[in-house]
Design a protein with these regions (language model features):
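Hydrophobic pocket/interface hotspot
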Residues: 31, 43, 111
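Short, low-complexity N-terminal intrinsically disordered segments enriched in polar/charged residues
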Residues: 11-39
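Short, well-ordered alpha-helical segments enriched in acidic and aromatic residues
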Residues: 38-53
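Bacterial N-terminal signal peptides
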Residues: 1-7
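Low-complexity, intrinsically disordered terminal/linker segments enriched in charged
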Residues: 15, 89-90, 102-106, 114-144
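Surface-exposed, charged secondary-structure patches
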Residues: 14, 19, 52-108
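Short, flexible helical or helix-coil boundary motifs
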Residues: 35, 39-42, 64-67, 76, ...
């Protein structure tokens, strides 16, 4: 019985989410807009590990420069790029973006619902690992 209970999180069902209250879509767009404007602190504040997220964003900005940083995230707002799926496992979400301007490459963002609000999911978890596998599956299907 204990083994079954320990394995239960691994058996969590993935489900597709439509736009609405169960979706992390609005939070994702807010984060992307902050990043496209170079507003690292505001974007990092929408994470479940804000200090670490800020450090990662700052390091990336410092490595590519301010303008390239803004372009990198601003591209998600470009009309050729679109959100093609939102997959949930428990409170966690994977948003899958098709980047048309990058040859249809797929990019993923991870969010988690905390106290009724979605934030960037920067804390490792079993469900997040499973969502990474889902993203790999989407990418493999896209190639075939």
């Amino acid at each position: 019985m204990a083994l079954l209970l320990a394995a239960a999180p691994a058996l969590a069902q993935e489900r597709l989410i439509e736009p609405g209250p169960e979706s992390a879509r609005e939070t994702a767009l807010t984060v992307i807009k902050h990043l496209a404007a170079g507003e690292l602190e505001q974007a990092a504040g929408l994470s479940n590990a804000p200090k670490r997220r800020f450090e990662v964003l700052r390091d990336y900005r410092d490595s590519v420069g301010e303008e390239q940083f803004k372009r990198s995230f601003g591209r998600f707002l470009s009309p050729e790029n679109r959100l093609i799926a939102e997959v949930a496992i428990g409170p966690r979400r994977l948003l899958v973006w098709e980047l048309g301007e990058a040859g249809g490459e797929l990019a993923g963002q991870f969010y988690v619902e905390v106290d009724g609000k979605f934030v960037l999911d920067d804390v490792p978890s079993r469900e997040r690992d499973e969502l990474r596998r889902v993203l790999r599956r989407y990418r493999a299907e896209k190639k075939s």
